Amino acid sequence: MKQLYGVIGNPIGHSLSPVMHNNAFEHLNMDAHYHAFLVEEEVLGEAVRGLKALGISGFNVTTPHKVAIMEYLDEIDPLARKIGAVNTVVHKNGRLIGYNTDGIGFVRALQSISHEPLQGKRILLLGAGGASRAIYFSLADVGVKEIDVANRTVDKAKELIAARTADVNSVALSLEKATEEQGNYDIIIQTTTIGMHPHVEHTPLQICSLKKGTIVSDIIYNPFETKILCEAKEQGAIIQNGIDMFVYQGALAFEMWTGSVPNIGRMKQLVIEKLGG
C-alpha cells in the first residue's frame, strides 16, 4: 500500500517540500507520496485528527502551525519541547510524535561547510525568534559552549538565553554592539527575515571587520545571496544561504519517517532548480 506523507501550513502553494520528497521516494524506489495540505488555523485540530485517521505515515508542519500543533500530538520529543515548536510529526504505533528538525538540520548544514568541529567555536546569532531558538538549543545540544544572541530588542535575546538548560556561555547584545564585536566570532548566523525578497537592500548587521576564516550563514534563500552574505563574501568569509538548512532538515525528516537516507546533493540541486538558480 502506498505510504502517505505531507506538509501542513497556510499558505502552502509555494512549498518546495513535495518535489524534494517525491523525487527522493522515486529515486529510492519507494511506494510513497508527499502532498501539500492547506490547513487553516481554526481547523488545525480536525485536520490533525483527519490525517491520523487516514493513516498518514508522517508530515511536516510549517507556518503558522509549528507551536499550535503541539497540543494535538500524543508525544513531543524533549528537544522540540525545549524549542517550543514542532516541524516534523512521525505516526508510529497509532501515536503522533512531534519533533523539530529545523535546528538539527541547520547544525548539519553548518557542519557540512565547517572544516573544524563546532564545539570550540564562538558563535553569534542574529535574531531571537523561533528559528533562532531552534538553532540555539540545537547548537547547545551538540556541545557548543559560546553562543551570543543579538536582537533589535535586547530583552527578547535575554529571554532566549534565560531558557537555556545546557552549560552555555551566552551574552545578549544590541545589533549596534554586535556590529562592534563582530570580529570576535568564528561563526555569525542570520536568523531573521531581514534582507528577504523584496527588501533585499536591508541587513540586520553591517559586515565590516570579520576575522579571517569566519563563516557567515543566513537562513534566507530568496535571494540566494542576501546583503549580509554579499558583504561577508567581500570580506573573504565562507558564506552559506538557507538552502542547505532547508535541505538538511527535510532529509532528516525523511530519514525519521522511512529509515532511509536520501541523497542530499540531489535534493539540493532540485531545490536550486525550482528556485530558478
Curated annotation (Swiss-Prot):
CDD domains: NAD_bind_Shikimate_DH. Transmembrane segments: none annotated. It catalyses: shikimate + NADP(+) = 3-dehydroshikimate + NADPH + H(+). Its EC number is 1.1.1.25. Keywords: Amino-acid biosynthesis, Aromatic amino acid biosynthesis, NADP, Oxidoreductase. The active site is at residue 66. Pathway: Metabolic intermediate biosynthesis; chorismate biosynthesis; chorismate from D-erythrose 4-phosphate and phosphoenolpyruvate: step 4/7. It comes from the Bacteria. GO terms for biological process: amino acid biosynthetic process; aromatic amino acid family biosynthetic process; chorismate biosynthetic process; shikimate metabolic process. The keyword Repeat does not apply. One of its GO terms (cellular component) is cytosol. PANTHER family: BIFUNCTIONAL 3-DEHYDROQUINATE DEHYDRATASE_SHIKIMATE DEHYDROGENASE, CHLOROPLASTIC, SHIKIMATE DEHYDROGENASE. Belongs to the shikimate dehydrogenase family. This is Shikimate dehydrogenase (NADP(+)). The lineage of its organism: Bacteria, Bacillati, Bacillota, Bacilli, Bacillales. The gene is aroE.
